[in-house]
Amino acid sequence: MSKKIIHIFAMIPFFCACEKVWEADLREKALDTIRGIYEIESAVWEGQEPLDINGDGNATFDYYSEYLSIDAGTGDYKSYINNKSASIMIPVISRVYGYNGSERLIRDRWEITGYTNVLIEGESARVEMTFEKNIEFKHTGYGEFTVRTDVTVPDNQGRDSTAPVLMKFIRVNYLGK
């Protein structure tokens, strides 16, 4: 009888180690669903009125097409998510004043860093991110996510408007561990 009890106690560390391996596998699987290089697929202005920030006379809620049509240089708007942290590029439009008092709109990249946490609940895991600014991050499927955040942009009449913008990102390249 005492040998059986000794064997049972000797097996406890083995079973605990198995549970930890299972958690590590689950954590890795959850991170694997989101790891990669992403591009913005769409960005929708959620304000009351449509925007005409490029001054072409066509107001729209398609924030990303308005944003890309501004003639203010080019940019690479890729986002990177790895094991420990995430860099998400938020398209922002800024107003810059020249030395003579004139103003112009420029395209700007606003980098926000978040930290990836994998929450394990029962037999499933989900990815959560915490950002410096108020951002709603939602993992919507394998290799895609959405981000909603407030953006302030000037319109073509010089007024600033602030409203949420919902951006959808899709993975264009997988990043290994």
Describe these PLM feature segments.
Residues 46, 69-144, 170-172:
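Contiguous, well-ordered beta-strand patches that form the walls/edges
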Residues 97, 143-177:
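Edge beta-strand at a domain terminus
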Residues 40-81:
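Short, solvent-exposed loop/hinge segments that bridge or flank secondary-structure elements
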Residues 3-8:
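Sec-dependent signal peptide recognition
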